[in-house]
UniProtKB/Swiss-Prot annotation:
A Pfam family assignment: GnRH
GO cellular component entries: extracellular space
A GO molecular-function annotation: gonadotropin hormone-releasing hormone activity
Stated role: Stimulates the secretion of gonadotropins; it stimulates the secretion of both luteinizing and follicle-stimulating hormones.
Residues spanning the signal sequence: 1-24
Family note: Belongs to the GnRH family.
Glycine amide: residues bearing it: G34
Main location: secreted
Record's protein name: Progonadoliberin-2
Amino acid sequence: MASSRRGLLLLLMLLTAHPGPSEAQHWSHGWYPGGKRALSSAQDPQNALRPPAGSPAQATYGLPSDALAHLEDSMPWEGRTMAWWSLRRKRYLAQTLLTAAREPRPVPPSSNKV
């Protein structure tokens, strides 16, 4: 009876005690945000050949090849599409409001008919 209680208590402690989220990145996420790997990068960045010390390439070795890419190139196509459509909606709304403000408002029919 005591061993079953001890086992149940141990099981309960194991189920409730959680070490927290892992700081490691899952292999499917890649090295860069969005889960993409640069095509020019080696499969294992630790074993990549480094340029000689003192060369200009040594200073930029730690940067990914697309670190200075334009926003459109670095954004996934889903994000680009969503940003484009929200921009078009905002532009359409602003245009509609501006043209509605310029047009004269129709005079409502009077209810004082004799």
